[in-house]
Design a protein with these regions (language model features):
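Carbohydrate-binding/catalytic loop surfaces
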Residues: 21-44, 79-104, 141-175
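Solvent-exposed beta-strand/loop surfaces of large extracellular or lumenal domains
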Residues: 261-287, 305-310
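C-terminal beta-rich recognition modules with glycine/proline-rich loops and embedded aromatic residues
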Residues: 64, 123-131, 136-239, 278, ...
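Beta-strand-rich binding/interaction modules
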Residues: 248-268
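Well-ordered alpha-helical segments within folded domains of soluble proteins
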Residues: 1, 35-53, 97-113, 181-191
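Catalytic cores of extracellular degradative/oxidative enzymes
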Residues: 1-35, 39, 49, 58-59
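Structural helix-adjacent loops and short alpha-helical linkers that scaffold large soluble proteins
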Residues: 1-7, 52-65, 72, 113-123, ...
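Long, well-ordered core segments of solenoidal/helical folds
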Residues: 3-23, 63-80, 127-138, 212
Length: 449
């Protein structure tokens, strides 16, 4: 069976010259720039990694790694999801992504995490889920966008600027084709699936963080244990674990140290653990654990200012990308849109106040972190655990794109690119950015002054 799989993959690659553009995308080991259907590419690029896991042939793993690296180089957006309005579409402030990719990326990257043991794959999974994933749905999870984007200033039945069907950026329970409606339900289960992993040496690895419990059999004696994880991650920095076991047992317990965290610390029963805690790697506690042992991982979240094409700028803190939330007027989609119901309504959102800000930010010193401990559901719009206060100025010429539809004679409004003229209007003011995932309309990549 394995030989057949290798033969099939070799054939899969070898006849690409006789295929269309989609076929040329599958030559993952070359410098060919991916330019076809993003969902298919992300699904297929894990195949050589799976073959590596069964054969040990490093050339398979290298093909998968190269295929992903070039996709990220040319298409990865601030949301943690590659641009892909059906086809890959490059990096710009106008780029967006198909919601199917919110599921396929953590699925494929989960395989890469398991096959390689490289902690940075988990970093990428959490960024995609917490930002691009949750940012594409209403916070009650009853409506989603077919296309979503880091910058989306309007979301109506005719505002889609990414091509194909006009309504694909509206928040609806179903779209013109149902692939995204099915796939949107997968991204969070895939996150949960990768939270806890078994290690080859009889231990466990906490790879993606969130309050949870795991029952495992560990150590040379295959002793059953329960580990209880308690945290408010990704909004707070402390992650606590308690080991519950009927008898003492020695086993390796691995903790992911995110690549963005420079000063993580690990304590056991209140005492700091010696050893190098390296960003982007797993830290291993290989010791005898007793019932009630408490492990605490502290991962400080620093502010990071990111650069984007066309002199764009974004801001992150830990795994969370921050956006300016655009207050909106929500109109319920009328009953003649048959996929919207009373239980699962659809919405058109139009901006209700100004959003045309440029940022006056050079580095993290220009950003103030504002914490709020009084919250319940952290993704609720307007009730955020962490906000970032930043200096900004409005741009005179940054407005919604508009055109007159020749058939209906109606004026159509769409999200717009950065203006060529960055003349400001008004004085410097301070605006508050919130987690990307808690927004519906937003600005995530800003023009920089």
């Amino acid at each position: 069976m394995l030989q057949k799989a290798e033969t099939a993959y070799a054939t899969f690659k070898s006849d690409h010259k006789y295929r269309d553009r989609d076929g040329r995308d599958i030559i993952f080991g070359t410098d060919h720039v991916p330019n076809y259907h993003g969902v298919v590419y992300i699904e297929l690029v894990k195949i050589p990694a799976i073959l590596y896991s069964y054969t040990g042939k490093k050339e398979y793993l290298q093909e998968a790694q190269n295929g992903i690296a070039k996709m990220e180089k040319y298409d990865m957006l601030a949301s943690g999801i590659p641009s892909s309005n059906e086809h890959f579409n490059g990096i710009s402030e106008m780029a967006g992504h198909e919601t199917c990719n919110l599921a396929t990326l953590p699925y494929t990257y989960g395989y890469m995490l398991q096959v390689t043991g490289d902690a940075t794959w988990a970093d990428k999974i959490e960024k995609a889920v917490f930002n691009g994933g949750i940012g594409a749905v209403t916070k009650d999870f009853r409506a989603e966008q077919y296309f979503s984007a880091p910058n989306q200033f309007i979301a109506t039945l005719n505002s889609n600027h990414l091509g194909y069907q006009n309504a694909r950026m509206a928040f609806l329970p179903g779209h013109d084709t149902e692939c995204c409606t099915g796939n949107v339900n997968r991204f969070m289960p895939y996150y949960i699936q990768q939270m806890w992993l078994e290690t080859k040496n009889g231990g466990v690895a906490a790879s993606l963080y969130g309050s949870s419990e795991i029952n495992a059999v560990v150590g040379a004696g295959k002793v059953p244990v329960k580990i209880v994880e308690t945290t408010k991650y990704p909004f707070e920095e402390a992650i606590a674990f308690e080991v519950q076991t009927q008898k003492t047992v020695k086993f390796p317990f691995r903790l992911r140290i995110p690549a963005w965290c420079a000063n993580a610390t690990v304590t056991v029963n209140g005492k700091k653990v010696d050893g190098k805690v390296i960003p982007g790697e797993f830290f291993e506690l290989n010791r005898v654990f007793a019932n009630g042992d408490k492990i605490t991982l502290l991962i400080p979240m620093d502010v990071k200012v990111t650069s984007w094409p066309n002199n764009g700028v974004g801001i992150e803190r830990g795994p969370i990308v921050y956006s300016y939330p655009i207050a909106s007027t929500a109109d319920t989609v009328s009953g003649d849109y048959k996929k919207a119901t009373k239980a699962f309504p659809g919405f058109e959102l139009t901006p209700a106040h100004d959003w045309n800000y440029s940022l006056l930010v050079n580095n993290s010193n220009d950003v103030e972190v504002v914490k709020n401990s009084n919250y319940t559901y952290p993704w609720k719009v307007g009730a955020n655990p962490v906000r970032l206060k930043v200096p900004a100025q409005k741009l005179k010429d940054w407005k919604l794109n508009s055109y007159v539809d020749t058939a209906s004679k109606a004026t159509i409004y769409q999200t717009s690119p950065f203006p060529a003229n960055r003349e400001t209007t008004g004085d410097k003011e301070y605006i508050e950015l919130v987690p990307y995932g808690s927004t519906l309309l937003r600005v995530t990549v800003f023009p920089k002054q």
